[in-house]
Amino acid sequence: MKRRYSSYSDQKTQRHKIRWVVAGVLVFFLSYTSFTSLFFSMRVLENDTMAPNLSPGDRFLFSSHSYFSLVPGIGDENIPVNLRRGSVVLVNMFRGSSPGLLSRTLDGTIRFFTAQNFSLIEQKENIYIKRLIGLPGDEISMVNYVIRVRVEGSAFSLTENEVSEYDYTIEIPQMPALWDSALPFSGNMDPFILGKNEYFVISDDRSNTNDSRTWGPVSIRNITGTALFRYWPLSSMGRL
């Protein structure tokens, strides 16, 4: 039986190749996690609050606004984010300090290797996927679960679909026949005007009130991302 022996030069070349492969993989993951931590994030819708347009298990690519929090001296009024009525946004209602870059990078790595099924940050944050309806200066009201918006400077209000830049359908709950429309969350809401840096977000399924009807208007810093693309399921893949 013959034995094969490689020369010292061959072994050195092989080790050199292995080091380059390991270094390449390391650079790829560091670049990926840093990039996704600062500029993009992938999220899974875990409930039916956005029915009938979005379904539980849908997976999305969001643009991330979190990198603005790393720039010192940027106030809410100076955050250069172009938010549009009707867009799907990522809302973080966590009241504490935002996770740092290291935490986000580590979280991105864990999310990558677990196919977005586990997150360190989401255990500490309150992350929601919602529909953005109102911008600063808008007058917001609700009639029979349909939001009406009077855009700042306009003399009259329009329905949310008329002012939206995106097409979507809302799901209106069926209330009991004797339900009092004056009760909270009955589908009606008196007009109010959004202040500076205030936004109104809501669920497409109006039976779910875990939105601005409960929280009140949200700050630009609560809106941490804008949905760009649904990549799963494949049958629904496309821009939002």
Question: What is each model feature region?
Answer:
Residues 20-38:
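Hydrophobic membrane-insertion alpha-helices, especially the h-region
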